[in-house]
From Swiss-Prot:
It comes from Sinorhizobium fredii (strain NBRC 101917 / NGR234). One of its GO terms (cellular component) is membrane. InterPro entries: FAD/NAD-bd_sf, Flavin-dep_Halogenase_NPB, Flavin_halogenase, Trp_halogen. Keywords: Membrane, Plasmid, Transmembrane, Transmembrane helix. It is a single-pass membrane protein. This is Uncharacterized protein y4xG. GO terms for molecular function: monooxygenase activity.
Length: 505
C-alpha cells in the first residue's frame, strides 16, 4: 500500500542528538512550511555511535542541508580527517603501519583505469611500493601539518585528497539544534513511552506519559533505546556477532599531542583502539571482545600502552548488526536505532548519512506520495548496504596476527560466504567495482569504493603481489609498455614485466 503524506500535519522525530536534528533539518526542507516538524528530545545514547571520526559523505550531508562549514568547524571543534592510520594490525612489530587515505581527483594512479582495474596501482602493488605515497597530500601527515597548512593545500586543488572532519558530538548537536530551531522546527523535552498504531499498522501518535502527540510520519533517532523497530514493530535483528568480534568498548579522552589529520586505529590484544584528534582533546576508545578481556583488563592494557593512567568515561555493550526492515509504513529508524557497528572506518556515520539522503530523496521525488515498492527498495538497499559494511570491516581483521588468543581464534574463524567469495577473487586480482555492486542499489551509493578495499586488502596481504602481477600480464602490449614506463619512473630501476613471472627486480 502506498504512503500518502500530502495532507500531513506533523512529522515527529524521537530523540535529538546529531541524527534526530539532522533528520529534522532535512525533512523541514522536504515538507511544506505549514507542516510541523517536532523533535522529542528524549534522552539518547550514542545515536551516531561512539567515536568522533567523520565519514566521506559528511561534507555532502552538511552542504545538502545548507549548513555553514566554517560555523560547523568552530562549534563542533572539528579538525581535518584525511584518512586512517592503522598500527599493529599485521603483527609485524614496529613499524607496522599502513594508511587508507581519502584519495580524490588528480591522481594518475586512481584515474587510470583499464578493463575494470587500476594498472598503475597494480604496478605499485607488484613492485611492493606503498599505495598511500602516490597521493600528493600525504606530505601533510609526514610533516604534521597544522590545520591552516591543510586548508591552504586543499584550496589549491592539488592535494589529491577529499577531506572529512573529526568532530565533537556535543558541539555538533548544539549547532544542529540551534539551526533547527531557527528554521522553525519545534522542540519538546519528553520521554516517549510508546506509540499508538492504527488498524493499518501506521504510527498515529507518540505516547508521552500523560498525553499523546499525533503524528503523520515518524522517525526514530532514539539511539540504543530503539523504541520503534525493537519495541513496537518487533522487527527481526540480523546480528553480526559471528563475523565482527568486538562486543564491548571503553571510551576515554586523551590530552592533545600535536596536529594529526588522520584517525589512528591501533590493534590491541583483544580488539582495537581508536584516537580521533579534536581541537582541545583526543577522543579515544578501545573496542574489545568480552571473550578475551573485561573492562578492567582493557583499561590496564590501554594504560600500559600509553604509560599513564586513563579514566573510562563510558563502558558500552556493542551489539553489532541491523534490523532487517528500517522503514515500516509511516515509520523509519535512523542511526543506532536502525543498526550498529563498531566505530571502525566511521561506518555507522557513513551509513546514517546515506540512509537519511535516500529517505529525503524518496519523499521529495515522490512529492510525499511513496509507492510500497519504493519502501521495499529502500529496505532492500539498506540491508545490502549493511552487508557491505560488515564485509568491509571483516576485511580489517583478516590479518596474519596470531600472537594472542583473540587473533589466533580470528585467524581460524569461518568467514561469511560473501566475503569469503570476494577474498578468493582477491587472491587472483585486485578489488573491482563489480565486487561492491551487490552492496548497493535502489539509488543508494557505495560507502566504500574499490580504492578503499584495495587500501586495506593489499597491506594485509589479502591481495598478494602475485595477484597484481597476474592482472598486469593480461594487459595489451601498449598498456604494458605504459605501465613499465611508470614503474621505471617510480623506482628508477630496470624492473621488467615478464610474461611468465610478473615483475622482476
Amino acid at each position: 500500500m502506498m504512503l500518502d503524506l500530502t495532507n500531513a500535519k506533523r512529522i515527529g522525530i524521537i530523540g535529538g542528538g546529531i541524527v534526530g536534528w539532522l533528520a529534522a533539518i532535512a525533512l523541514r526542507r522536504v515538507f511544506d512550511v505549514d507542516v510541523d516538524v517536532t523533535v522529542i528530545e528524549a534522552p539518547t545514547v550514542f545515536p551516531l555511535g561512539p567515536g568522533e571520526g567523520g565519514s566521506l559523505n559528511l561534507i555532502d550531508t552538511l552542504c545538502r542541508n545548507e549548513l555553514d562549514l566554517d560555523v560547523f568547524i568552530g562549534e563542533a571543534g572539528a579538525t581535518h580527517k584525511l584518512g586512517v592510520l592503522y598500527e599493529n594490525w599485521r603483527g609485524g612489530g614496529i613499524p607496522d603501519r599502513y594508511y587508507r587515505m581519502f584519495g580524490g581527483s588528480g591522481i594518475p594512479e586512481i584515474e587510470c583505469r583499464v578493463g575494470g582495474f587500476f594498472p598503475l596501482l597494480s604496478a605499485r602493488i607488484a613492485a611492493g611500493e606503498n599505495l598511500h605515497t602516490c597521493i600528493p597530500g600525504f606530505e601533510l601527515i609526514t610533516k604534521k601539518a597544522s590545520q591552516v597548512e591543510i586548508d591552504e593545500l586543499l584550496a589549491t586543488g592539488e592535494s589529491g585528497l577529499y577531506p572529512s572532519f573529526h568532530f565533537n558530538h556535543a558541539g555538533f548537536e548544539r549547532y544542529l539544534r540551534r539551526v533547527g530551531l531557527a528554521r522553525g522546527i519545534t522542540s519538546r523535552r519528553a520521554v516517549v513511552h510508546g506509540m499508538r498504531l492504527d488498524d493499518r499498522g501506521h504510527v498515529n501518535a507518540f505516547q508521552l506519559g500523560g498525553e499523546e502527540l499525533e503524528v503523520d510520519f515518524a522517525v526514530d533517532a532514539s539511539g540504543f533505546a530503539r523504541l520503534g523497530l525493537g519495541k513496537v514493530f518487533n522487527t527481526r535483528w540480523c546480528s553480526f556477532a559471528n563475523v565482527l568480534p568486538t562486543d564491548r568498548a571503553i571510551i576515554f579522552e586523551l590530552e592533545p599531542r600535536g596536529s594529526s589529520p588522520v584517525t589512528r586505529a591501533t590493534a590491541m590484544k583483544a580488539g582495537w583502539m581508536w584516537e580521533a584528534p579534536l581541537n582541545r582533546s583526543i577522543s579515544a576508545g578501545y573496542a574489545f571482545s568480552s571473550r578475551y578481556a573485561d573492562a578492567a583488563m582493557a583499561i590496564a592494557e590501554v594504560e600500559n600502552h600509553y604509560g599513564f593512567r586513563v579514566e573510562a568515561k563510558h563502558e558500552l555493550s556493542l551489539d553489532q548488526g541491523y534490523f532487517s526492515t528500517a522503514w515500516v509504513n509511516n515509520f523509519v529508524a535512523l542511526g543506532t536505532a536502525s543498526g550498529f557497528v563498531e566505530p571502525l572506518e566511521a561506518a555507522l556515520a557513513a551509513h546514517t548519512f546515506e540512509a537519511l539522503r535516500n529517505l529525503e530523496r524518496i519523499l521529495a521525488n515522490g512529492s510525499g506520495i511513496v509507492p510500497a515498492r519504493a519502501i521495499e527498495g529502500y529496505n532492500s538497499a539498506n540491508a545490502r548496504c549493511w552487508t557491505g559494511v560488515r564485509d568491509f570491516l571483516r576485511l580489517h581483521y583478516d590479518s596474519k596476527r596470531i600472537d594472542t588468543p583473540f587473533w589466533r581464534d580470528l585467524a581460524a574463524a569461518e568467514l561469511p560466504e560473501g566475503y569469503a567469495n570476494l577474498r578468493a577473487c582477491f587472491q587472483k586480482r585486485t578489488p573491482r567495482f563489480i565486487d561492491i555492486q551487490p552492496y548497493v542499489g535502489s539509488g543508494w551509493q557505495s560507502l566504500f569504493h574499490e580504492i578503499d578495499w584495495i587500501s586495506v586488502a593489499v597491506p594485509l596481504g589479502v591481495v598478494p603481489q602475485a595477484a597484481a602481477c597476474a592482472e598486469l600480464r593480461r594487459l595489451s602490449t601498449e598498456s604494458r609498455s605504459e605501465v613499465q614506463a611508470y614503474v621505471d619512473r617510480l623506482k628508477g630501476t630496470i624492473a621488467k614485466i615478464s610474461s611468465t613471472r610478473g615483475y622482476m627486480h
